[in-house]
Amino acid sequence: QHSKLYMESLEGFDFANETNSLYIAAVEFAQAAREYPIVFGKDPQDVVFPVALLGLRPNQNLYVDKEGKWNASYIPAYARRYPFILAKGGAEEEQFTVCIDEGYKGFNTAKEGQALFDKKGEQTDVLNQAVDFLKDYQNHVQLTTLFCANLAELDLLEPMTANIEMTSGEKLSIGGFQCVSREKLKALKPGKLAD
């Protein structure tokens, strides 16, 4: 289906301009925490996951400007993988399918940019690089899931609400997330912390 597809690398993160939080892998914490608050959410199955907060309101990303430029030194891998994503698929639980956002403006059949497949139908370097990035990203997601499960098991997370007063005087309250309790972390036995 996509054998004749070409991709132009377009600068810009317009696709994320209304995204107020993004998944962040544990391996990214050190770099991401310099620019974004990192908090934890829970899915309907009570699985804990980390996110970088990008906005104070729904559909607000304070890091993407009107031209689609990301105004931060570090861009989360979740955004950098676009327009490619992995979707669970197949009989195996750990089997994933590489998917694309067909609405991405850089995709075309006019042979502009780089082909995703060569004349023999094999993946080109550009697609191989995207697939390698996705595989690496998914490995980090799995490690992050284990890390977050440990945080929950050690009861280190607590609900938090952030109360913010804007320079205009407007007051905002952001809740529905968790953070690591400093008191519980300090009280943790050294052996448990090493786990």
Summary of predicted features, one role per range:
Residues 49-117:
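Aromatic- and glycine-enriched beta-alpha-beta binding-site module
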Residues 45-47, 68, 169:
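Detector for glycine-centered tight turns/loop "hinges" at secondary-structure junctions
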Residues 43-45, 79, 179:
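Short, glycine-/Ser/Thr-/acidic-enriched flexible segments
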Residues 26-31, 75-77, 151-156:
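Short linear motifs in intrinsically disordered
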Residues 14-18, 59-62, 67, 140-146:
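Short, basic/low-complexity N-terminal boundary segments at the transition from targeting/disordered tails
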Residues 1-54:
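Short, extreme N-terminal leader segments that mark the start of a protein/domain
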Residues 33-35, 74, 81, 159:
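Short beta-strand-initiation
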Residues 86, 91-195:
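A contiguous, surface-oriented mixed alpha/beta subdomain in the mid-to-C-terminal portion of proteins
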